[in-house]
UniProtKB/Swiss-Prot annotation:
Belongs to the Mg-chelatase subunits D/I family. Redox regulation; active in reducing conditions, inactive in oxidizing conditions. Thioredoxins f and m mediate the reversible reductive activation of oxidized CHLI. PANTHER family: MAGNESIUM-CHELATASE SUBUNIT CHLI, MAGNESIUM-CHELATASE SUBUNIT CHLI-2, CHLOROPLASTIC. This is Magnesium-chelatase subunit ChlI. It is found in: Plastid, Chloroplast. It catalyses: protoporphyrin IX + Mg(2+) + ATP + H2O = Mg-protoporphyrin IX + ADP + phosphate + 3 H(+). Signal peptide: none annotated. It comes from Nephroselmis olivacea. One of its GO terms (biological process) is photosynthesis. ATP binds at G46, D47, R48, G49, T50, G51, K52, S53.
């Protein structure tokens, strides 16, 4: 089964990101991961037909093009050694010139039936032994380097494959070892998983590895439902004209994201706020330090998105539920929703009203 790779030549028109109505939590989580991929991806859980796949594809269409080494299966960065394949890195060390081109940020769909070899890549052992060369067939992780790897119904994916994806997403590298032969290549991507909670949850150990967890539901307001239906009908009738009507807002958001990524390094969080973030994590009995780290990163990304260089209490309040709700221990006797519990503790520690 082949993966679907989104390219600039893609025939199917994509619904504009700025035209998507509602689902603010999901959209914010995706934008923050684009600004700082080290947040660690996002898990989107929600009902069927709530726009999960549409929003992810719309995000990719929104992103600016990137410069890559020509004819390189790993989308190697021409100047950053951490994002180069071994072959490109060796050429650079030898002082050889490399040709570059620009391309849309890749989006790779991971099919549910994918095998580990299809995901990680394979080594041709026979060719390696007879010809003495490392014959490597890149997998989906190679294609997703510097892009987005999207797994729909990730809660139905084999746990071992989810582990492989999360390991690569965290380290930025994929290592394939067969019969004493080892190949390593960059695999730095934003991992986006989506699923329907009715079809089962991820194991807590795996869920904790996702940076953020967005919950979305079916829109209930009749007026909003009518607006969504009408927008979709207009898009289906004339996609080109519909997309043109959102060109200005799309370009504005693309520019905002580019500026936010450049601004991110300048953003600072006061020590007192960092202590309070850790206090919230401690009082919620969050295991490990991932929650602290991700919350700090996400708050900085939000400040950068809104054009500021310092994190505010409001920034933390807007993202802390996204960063912590999936890290709480499940208590069968607990009646309060995990997101509400996070906001409750946040308001006590920070002395604010719950958002």
């Amino acid at each position: 089964m082949n993966a679907t790779i989104t390219t600039s030549e893609q025939a199917r028109p994509v619904f504009p990101f700025t035209a998507i109505v509602g689902q603010e939590e999901m959209k914010l989580a995706l934008l923050l991961n684009v600004i700082d991929p080290k947040i660690g991806g996002v898990m989107i859980m929600g009902d069927r037909g709530t726009g999960k796949s549409t929003t992810v594809r719309a995000l990719v269409d929104l992103l600016p093009e990137i410069e890559v080494v020509e004819n390189d299966p790993f989308n190697s960065h021409p100047y950053d050694p951490e994002l180069m394949s071994d072959e490109v890195r060796e050429k650079v060390h030898r002082g050889e010139s490399i040709r570059t081109t620009t391309t849309k940020i890749p989006m790779v769909d991971l099919p549910l039936g994918a095998t580990e070899d299809r995901v990680c890549g394979t080594i041709d052992i026979e060719k390696a032994l007879t010809e003495g060369v490392k014959a490597f067939e890149p997998g989906l992780l190679a294609k997703a380097n510097r892009g987005i790897l999207y797994v729909d119904e990730v809660n139905l994916l084999d746990d071992h494959l989810v582990d492989v994806l999360l390991d690569s997403a965290a380290s930025g590298w994929n290592t394939v070892e067969r019969e004493g032969i080892s190949i390593c290549h960059p695999a730095r991507f934003i991992l986006v998983g989506s699923g329907n909670p009715e079809e089962g949850e991820l194991r807590p150990q795996l869920l904790d590895r996702f940076g953020m967890h967005a919950q979305i539901g079916t829109v209930r307001e009749p007026e909003l439902r009518v607006k969504i239906v009408e927008q979709r009908a207009t898009f289906d009738e004339n996609p080109k004209e519909f997309r043109q009507s959102y060109e200005t807002s799309q370009a504005s958001l693309t520019s905002q994201l580019t500026e936010a990524r450049a601004r991110l390094r300048q953003v600072q969080t006061d020590y007192s706020l960092r202590v309070k973030i850790s206090q919230v994590c401690s009082e919620l009995n969050v295991d490990g330090l991932r929650g602290d780290i991700v919350t700090n990163r996400a708050a900085k990304a939000l400040a950068a998105l809104e054009g500021r260089t310092s994190v505010s209490v409001e920034d933390i309040g807007r993202i802390i539920t996204l960063c912590l709700r999936h890290r709480l221990r499940k208590d069968p006797l607990e009646s309060i929703d995990s997101g509400e519990k996070v906001q409750e503790v946040f308001s006590i520690v920070f002395g604010t009203n719950p958002l």
